[in-house]
Amino acid sequence: MSRARQELLSRTALGVFRLNGQFLAVAEELARPAGLTAARWQVLGAVLAEPLPVAGIARAMGITRQSVQRIADLLVERGLAEYRPNPAHRRAKLLAPTEAGRAAVARIGPRHAAFADRLADSFGEAELASAVELLERLAVVLDKLDPAVTEP
């Protein structure tokens, strides 16, 4: 790897780490009035369209199954989600939001929309769309690099 490419990789990773921290801070602020955390909002959001097994949520979110399991159990304990039987797998139950869970996510909607407008107005809607496309493409490429780290 050339020094220039190594620098590009470092700058990209550090930039994404910084963005991750910034987006998590925003998500915490948006979720708090609804009685959620960013992580709980993220897991609930993953199952709004359809119930999913914990492993499926983890794959979609790019985090460990154990982390999702812990959050899912908390959501169920608080009445925001429930486990349902999974016809495809007897032991891997499906996580689904309850009406209370859907209501909590819905309470985030107006503040989320207002922040989305502020961000698009400040950054530029076309620029934001381009950034999203680029980040999605980068994620696909990284997924295909198997293993992610190789010997020189």
Where are these regions (language model features)?
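Short, locally clustered residues in the helix-turn-helix/winged-helix DNA-binding domain
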Residues: 45-49, 109, 136
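N-terminal leader segment of winged-helix/HTH proteins
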Residues: 1-34, 126, 152
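Basic amphipathic alpha-helical segments that dock to polyanions
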Residues: 44, 57, 72-78
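C-terminal regulatory/oligomerization modules of transcriptional regulators
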Residues: 1-4, 126-152
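Alpha-helical linker/hinge and terminal dimerization helices associated
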Residues: 19, 23-26, 30, 61, ...
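N-terminal helix-turn-helix DNA-binding core of bacterial DNA-binding proteins
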Residues: 25-67, 150-152
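Charged, amphipathic alpha-helical coiled-coil/dimerization segments
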Residues: 24, 73-133
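Pre-recognition alpha-helix immediately N-terminal to the DNA-recognition helix
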Residues: 11, 15, 22, 26, ...
